[in-house]
Structure formats: structure tokens, C-alpha cells
Design a protein with these regions (language model features):
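Flexible glycine/acidic-rich beta-alpha junction loops that bind and position SAM and/or redox cofactors
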Residues: 147-155, 197, 297-303
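Single conserved hydrophobic/aromatic residue that forms the stacking wall/gate
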Residues: 1-17, 333-342
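A conserved beta-strand-loop-helix scaffold within acyl/acetyltransferase catalytic domains
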Residues: 39-77, 93-101, 237-283, 288-329
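Glycine-rich, N-terminal phosphate-binding loop and its surrounding beta-alpha-beta segment
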Residues: 71-82, 87-100, 113, 122, ...
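Acyl-donor binding region in acyl/amide transferases
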Residues: 100-184, 309-339
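Generic start-of-chain signal for non-secretory N-termini
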Residues: 16-33, 37-45
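A structural signal for short, well-ordered beta-strand segments and their strand-loop junctions
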Residues: 139-146, 187-195, 278
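Acyltransferase donor/substrate-recognition loop-hinge adjacent to the catalytic core
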Residues: 19-21, 169-250
């Protein structure tokens, strides 16, 4: 279970004490590398955290590479203990103007929020994000969130002894305790994650129900070729369904054409076609109305790699997981119109 904390306003989050800790903005590429590196340092010995792919982090956080900066602005901050000296925390402050306009809110988001077990560090980081947002007319601090809903979201509050995946946030148990101690925040939303054991043989009741729905409503399972998804436009159609399906969900922001092109190029192009399945409506010219996208679980390979780099041996470890028996389901959507048909 993951929480979504939200501030009750943008007053001071934390009253600063006399301390050697300083919050500094990231203004250079070297600073951004330090910002990214802190996560790997903090979770180096964790059995449950999964290191993120470093190039993916760089592309997401770089203004010249992430299409979300067409409608977002952001500032990254580092907490440094100058008595050591050492980086002891980080936070990203983000304003998604498109989402704010869509939901009629004045929110500054915080994400990439990691810190040592020191309330002064976490409090000062959140205060820096709140102050940055307040200077830009924002009235509320909410997170952890990314630039868009395709980024990692939420703060883990249960399941700390379960292995994570590369697609979601993992954090130490002390994180939510810090949020509780900072009384300005309250829970805004919950996300649930499920682990499903797939039987070797499909249960007869399940198979019979699927066959009944398929024949009664003229729905059909559809597999794709890579050419159909990438060059043929079906990949874009998948994300158009995402926009349609999620438009009324919590703080969802419609994906732009540039974002969709980027996701098709980055993820769909690399996907295993056996793990992408669609459902089409035979009564509507075989229109795509639902789909699921999974990837081979990279958890074991990334944990062995630890530093998020693919070179020199990371590629080999990732290639081995293509034969694994665990998958991570990343996208599972159904258009609103056929949901009542099962």
C-alpha cells in the first residue's frame, strides 16, 4: 500500500534549527548526477529496493529530454550536512501546469524524495519545495508525485519486506513516520499493488466466463506485431485509451502527443510482443477497447547490478531475465464504454 500525503496549505513545513545542514538547489549537470546518485548510496544495502535504470532517471529529470517540461517546471534540491560533508537528502519540486489547469488546483508536487532518518533533513527538504512553490503562486504541496502519472508515485506504508520493482517507489519504514511527525500533512490518496500467482492451468470457471463474454459481446483477443505498434500507430492508440480511461482518476493529466511518441519509442518498441495483449470489439469494426502490457521482471538483474548502469555487464543480466517466470504488469486499461460487459 502506498500513501499520497497532501499539505493543508503552504505555510512553513519545518522550523529550522541551528544546524550544519543546508539545502542547495541543483543548477548544473554535475549537481544532477549527484542528485541521481544519492538514491543508489542510500539504498546500497537494501534487499528490497530495486535500483532504477540510471539513463532513465537522467532522461526523466533532464529538461532537454523529457517532453513533460513542455508544461512543467521543476527545481531539484539537495540536503548537505557540511559537518561531514555529505549529501543526506534530495527532493524535486514540480509544478504541472496542465494538471493544475485540468483539476483547477494550485499544487506544487514533490517527488524523488529521499533522506536519511533525520527529521530535520526531511523537514527542511519539504520546506524548500513548499517555499519554491509558494514563490510561484502555489497553495498546496502534494506528493510523492512525478511530472506525470507515468512516473513513480506514492510513499510505501506497508509491505517493506517485499521486493519492489523498477516501476514503483520503494522507501524505508521511517519515511511515513516523518510525514506523520510533520503535522502539516494529511493522507490524500491510497494506491494498492497486488502480486498474483498464475496457475499452470487456467481454472475452468475462469475460462468458461471468458468464453461466455467473448461470444455474447463479440469481443476478441488481439495480438500485435512490433510493426503494428510502432510504425502502424497501434502503440499510439494504446496511450489514447490510457487518456480516455484515466481522465477522471485522481489528478490524472492527459498525455500529449509528444509524450505518447516518447513512451512508444522508449517502452513499446522494446517490449516482448508475447506480453502485450489487446481486446477488440467485433461490433465496432474491431476497435481496440482494452489492453494489457507486461514486461519481464527486471528486479533480480537490477539488484545484482546495484548501480543502475547497463555497462559493462548490466546488459547481460537484463538479457537473462527475458527467460524469467515473473512479469511486471505496467499497463492494464479498458475503455469506459464496455466495462459493464465484464
Amino acid at each position: 500500500i502506498r500513501d499520497q500525503p497532501r499539505s493543508r496549505g503552504l505555510g512553513d513545513v519545518y522550523k529550522r534549527q541551528m544546524t550544519d545542514i543546508r539545502i542547495i538547489p541543483v543548477t548544473t549537470k554535475k549537481g544532477l548526477r549527484t542528485f541521481i546518485q544519492f538514491y543508489y548510496n542510500l539504498y546500497e544495502g537494501s534487499k528490497y529496493a530495486v535500483p532504477y535504470l540510471r539513463f532513465d532517471e537522467w532522461n526523466t529529470l533532464s529538461k532537454d529530454k523529457n517532453p513533460a517540461f513542455d508544461f512543467c517546471e521543476a527545481q531539484y534540491f539537495l540536503a548537505i550536512d557540511y559537518s561531514i560533508p555529505k549529501v543526506v537528502g534530495r527532493i524535486a519540486a514540480i509544478i504541472n501546469h496542465c494538471a493544475n489547469d485540468q483539476w483547477n488546483k494550485k499544487q506544487v508536487r514533490f517527488g524523488w524524495f529521499d533522506f536519511i532518518d533525520n527529521l530535520e533533513v526531511s523537514g527542511m527538504l519539504l520546506d524548500a519545495a513548499a517555499h519554491w512553490g509558494r514563490e510561484r503562486g502555489m497553495e498546496e504541496l502534494v506528493g510523492p508525485l512525478g511530472f506525470t502519472d507515468m512516473d513513480r508515485e506514492g510513499m510505501l506504508i506497508e509491505g517493506f519486506h517485499e521486493k519492489s520493482t523498477m516501476y514503483i517507489n520503494y522507501n524505508y519504514p521511517y519515511y511515513p513516520k516523518h510525514m506523520d511527525a510533520l503535522e502539516l500533512f494529511q493522507k490524500d490518496n491510497d494506491w494498492l499493488e497486488y502480486r498474483i500467482k498464475v496457475p499452470e492451468v487456467t481454472p475452468p470457471k475462469f475460462a468458461k466466463t471468458a468464453q461466455f463474454i467473448e461470444s455474447r459481446y463479440n469481443l476478441h483477443v488481439r495480438k500485435f506485431t512490433k510493426h503494428e505498434l510502432v510504425q502502424g500507430g497501434m502503440g499510439k492508440e494504446i496511450f489514447h485509451i490510457v487518456n480516455e480511461t484515466y481522465k477522471d482518476l485522481y489528478d490524472f493529466q492527459q498525455l500529449t502527443d509528444r509524450q505518447i511518441d516518447g513512451y512508444v519509442d522508449s517502452y513499446i518498441k522494446m517490449a516482448d510482443m508475447n506480453l502485450i495483449t489487446g481486446v477488440v470489439d467485433g461490433n465496432d469494426n474491431n476497435r481496440l477497447i482494452g489492453f494489457g502490457v507486461s514486461f519481464p521482471s527486471m528486479t533480480e538483474a537490477l539488484q545484482k547490478n546495484r548501480n543502475g548502469k547497463l555497462l559493462p555487464w548490466g546488459w547481460l543480466r537484463l538479457l537473462r531475465v527475458m527467460k524469467c517466470h515473473a512479469t511486471d504488469t505496467c499497463l492494464l486499461y479498458t475503455s469506459p464504454s464496455p466495462r459493464d460487459r465484464g
